[in-house]
Amino acid sequence: MASVWTDIRAVLPSTVSEFPLDFSEKIDLSVLKCLELSRDQLYSEADCPVSAERAQIIIDYSWEKLNIGTWRDVDKEWRRVYSYGCLFKVLSLCHGNPPQNIIQEAVRTCDMSLLMGAAIMDNILQRLVGILRNKIKTTCPNKAERSEEPFSKKRKHDCKSEPVLNPTKEVPRIHCPSLERFRSDFLDPKKPVIIEGITDLWPAFTQHPWSIDYLRTVAGCRTVPIEVGSKYTDEEWSQKLITVNDFIDRYITGTEEDGVGYLAQHQLFDQVPELKEDIRIPDYCCLGEGDEDDITINAWFGPGGTVSPLHQDPQQNFLAQVVGRKYIRLYSPEDTKSLYPHESQLLHNTSQVEVENPDLVKFPDFSRASYEECVLCPGDVLFIPLQHWYYVRSLELSFSVSFWWS
């Protein structure tokens, strides 16, 4: 097997002139100088490793720029600088014959770029993390102590409260409707529906049935953002970055002391292409106005008991259930006033009402709002029309995939 550095060097540009460092005048000259020195050192005759200290200076300086003001106001140029800093740090870590812990640190650095930076050099950090993953000998700590366990096995936080559905309010189900029928019966009139049968051939159900150990194997060493707290409207709710292995150990198979953790609304499939190969974009998305590249695919992975408060999405949504079950309740946008949205701009798309335990003294009109409900099971795909309100509670360990499209 070739060394880590040999494989990494092979994906870098052959010459310094092919290594782009094009930035606008918004970037400080001192930062550009650091970037140029790091690049030039890489191509020196002595084949010296990139300075780890200089790479960290670039990362730290650009990190400060990323954390000033709101995220949407961050200039993309500084995100690119951050990614270059991460690239140079990875190159400094991997020069020579690094041990396993250093390779894992390099993977984390790549992930930080993928999460916080911007794509550079034809998404080179995504290619590097693929090389590094193949060099990690053990992606699952203590794997010898584990067996291949199905998701269906009862785990921490599995929910004891089973919903009793009202048959008159259940979301309708249909098996593989034609594009024309889906458009005429559900998309145009904005009616929720559960579509059955369209995930039958997904590799996530066939060649690579998703299990705890499978996720550890393909994504265990990857750093991801998780939400800590029962729901994002709680005061104690927070976010942090940990590896998928750590998330599973602490929040899926760990003790109750760790609280509730949720890998929610994260574009995991862009970060881990192996998982993206296990799913398929529903054909019905072609009825939208955008291209396939405009579809946002998010992962939702967590224990039973996780809750997404009653809220609206900014686009049409197909919610596909791969593992476990979820109770979902939907309300029409016509009932928005009766759902008491938060007044703050930050939470204007979220209701103040606890759906399954409403305070009808404080929110008296909530009981007048008409709703539909369902239990989404593995293989089901729920169409949630644009601006529909919906509430979600995981009944057990669950993995869902959402497709936002316009």
Curated annotation (Swiss-Prot):
Q: How is the cofactor bound?
A: Binds 1 Fe(2+) ion per subunit.
Name its GO BP terms in alphabetical order: circadian regulation of gene expression; G2/M transition of mitotic cell cycle; negative regulation of DNA-templated transcription; positive regulation of DNA-templated transcription
Record key words, sorted: Biological rhythms, Cell cycle, Chromatin regulator, Dioxygenase, Iron, Metal-binding, Nucleus, Oxidoreductase, Transcription, Transcription regulation
The protein's location, in the record's own words, is: Nucleus
UniProt domain JmjC: residue ranges: 270-406
Q: Does the keyword Cell membrane apply?
A: no
**Amino acids binding Fe cation:** H311, D313
Q: Where is the composition biased (Basic and acidic residues)?
A: 143-152
Cofactor(s) in the UniProt record: Fe(2+)
Q: What InterPro entries does the record tag this protein with? A: ARM_KDM8_N (IPR056520), Cupin_8 (IPR041667), JmjC_dom (IPR003347)
Q: Catalytic activity, per the record?
A: N(6),N(6)-dimethyl-L-lysyl(36)-[histone H3] + 2 2-oxoglutarate + 2 O2 = L-lysyl(36)-[histone H3] + 2 formaldehyde + 2 succinate + 2 CO2
Q: Tell me, what does this protein do in biology?
A: Histone demethylase required for G2/M phase cell cycle progression. Specifically demethylates dimethylated 'Lys-36' (H3K36me2) of histone H3, an epigenetic repressive mark, thereby acting as a transcription activator. May play a role in the regulation of the circadian clock.
Question: What's the protein name?
Answer: Lysine-specific demethylase 8
Organism of origin is: Danio rerio
High-level lineage: Eukaryota, Metazoa, Chordata, Craniata, Vertebrata
